[in-house]
């Protein structure tokens, strides 16, 4: 087992978690805003 490779993989995995969480959060915000606009359109009609 190559420990340097394993340590690099673990460091990359740990550092990629916040990035993926932030991107998922922004996607969720965009979708919820879109859904709210659709609901408002139906609410007026």
UniProtKB/Swiss-Prot annotation:
<comment type="function">
    <text>Together with movement protein P17, plays an essential role in virus long distance movement.</text>
</comment>
<comment type="similarity">
    <text>Belongs to the polerovirus movement protein P3a family.</text>
</comment>
<dbReference type="GO" id="GO:0044193">
    <property type="term" value="C:host cell mitochondrial outer membrane"/>
</dbReference>
<dbReference type="GO" id="GO:0044219">
    <property type="term" value="C:host cell plasmodesma"/>
</dbReference>
<protein>
    <recommendedName>
        <fullName>P3a</fullName>
    </recommendedName>
</protein>
<keyword id="KW-1031">Host cell junction</keyword>
<keyword id="KW-1040">Host Golgi apparatus</keyword>
<dbReference type="GO" id="GO:0016020">
    <property type="term" value="C:membrane"/>
</dbReference>
<keyword id="KW-0812">Transmembrane</keyword>
<feature type="transmembrane region" description="Helical">
    <location>
        <begin position="9"/>
        <end position="29"/>
    </location>
</feature>
<keyword id="KW-1045">Host mitochondrion</keyword>
<keyword id="KW-1133">Transmembrane helix</keyword>
<keyword id="KW-1043">Host membrane</keyword>
<keyword id="KW-1047">Host mitochondrion outer membrane</keyword>
<dbReference type="GO" id="GO:0044177">
    <property type="term" value="C:host cell Golgi apparatus"/>
</dbReference>
<keyword id="KW-0472">Membrane</keyword>
